[in-house]
Amino acid sequence: MASIINNPFTSLCCNTNKCEPNRICSLRSQQSLVFDNVNRKVGFPSVVCKAVSVQTKSPTEIEGLNIAEDVTQLIGNTPMVYLNTIVKGCVANIAAKLEIMEPCCSVKDRIGFSMISDAEEKGLISPGKTVLVEPTSGNTGIGLAFIAASRGYKLILTMPASMSLERRVILKAFGAELVLTDPAKGMKGAVSKAEEILNNTPDAYILQQFDNPANPKIHYETTGPEIWEDTKGKIDILVAGIGTGGTISGTGRYLKEKNPNIKIIGVEPTESNVLSGGKPGFIPGNLDQDVMDEVIEISSDEAVETAKQLALQEGLLVGISSGAAALAAIQVAKRPENAGKLIAVVFPSFGERYLSSILFQSIREECEKMKPEL
């Protein structure tokens, strides 16, 4: 694992840190990315080393290069790291799955790739013709936007106006068209607007992250196996946010199949605890409630404070949902019955995406008031 963190480009290599001269990259002939140095196989398409020949002006295989064919080849295989300081009082170990290290810094990079690829394989969409439409709170939109940009799709996203400014800027940077909706209506309002755009736009296709089976499927095929292999099957408990239902359902189902005794714990906001009979909302179609053994509610204030402490104590700059997942994992790790167990927790997104949000409000205000020393 250290080799991936310290040398991410050479970690794509077959099994050495330096490719041998005159050696054809073995990744080229495989059906998925293989990381022999960490004994890992992940179900993304194979890497093909290509370049344009100056003489023939046609794609030519180049020997010995460890270069991804395109940005989608960089999705997945995110590292895990133990939490060491914030876990005071815990009797179980907690290892965080750092989805913040995806190409666009969130777990939604996986489903952006999966949903677009799945629709292409089924002949439902094609670049340059289809207009992709999707409601999003931000991160799924970004996961779709960078892939849409790399493949030549026009993308229209609807998003509650309450989402952070950073997300809007990033989406526009990738060329996505952004339509803001009434924040009081939450994601329901964004979904309604997306359906309206779909009905009024020729050749439009809505990806439906909340109901698209390609969402949990990618987690079943990649996230689950990655956690299982990185923990050598020693994982006892998985803690993950509920969100669209994809991460916890797909990952949880895979882990349960490997070991039915693994506990799957979902995390949802106290302010919108639809699974616990709280305020109105909607339960996503992708959520497999049978996979979950327990649901823990975390308030927004608790999530924000925990995210701050992860930066200060662990050096991990994460988003609010990661703070919620971390606190839930810490609560579970303090239970006497979990002594000596291994808890894996998914950190879904990077903190830099929340600079304009309440997460960094006090720091932002402090920085805005700073004056130069003369």
Curated annotation (Swiss-Prot):
Binding site for pyridoxal 5'-phosphate: 139, 243-247, 321
Catalytic activities: O-acetyl-L-serine + hydrogen sulfide = L-cysteine + acetate
InterPro entries, per the entry: Cys_synth (IPR005856), Cys_Synth/Cystath_Beta-Synth (IPR050214), CysK (IPR005859), P-phosphate_BS (IPR001216), TrpB-like_PALP (IPR001926), TrpB-like_PALP_sf (IPR036052)
CDD domains documented for this protein: CBS_like
SUPFAM superfamilies: Tryptophan synthase beta subunit-like PLP-dependent enzymes
Span of the transit peptide along the chain: 1-50
Record keywords: Amino-acid biosynthesis, Chloroplast, Chromoplast, Cysteine biosynthesis, Plastid, Pyridoxal phosphate, Transferase, Transit peptide
Any one GO MF annotation of this record: cysteine synthase activity
Gene Ontology CC terms: chloroplast stroma; chromoplast
Keyword Signal part of the UniProt annotation: no
The protein's required cofactors: pyridoxal 5'-phosphate
Homology family: Belongs to the cysteine synthase/cystathionine beta-synthase family.
The protein's name in its UniProt record: Cysteine synthase, chloroplastic/chromoplastic
Native organism: Capsicum annuum (Capsicum pepper)
Highest classification ranks of the organism: Eukaryota, Viridiplantae, Streptophyta, Embryophyta, Tracheophyta
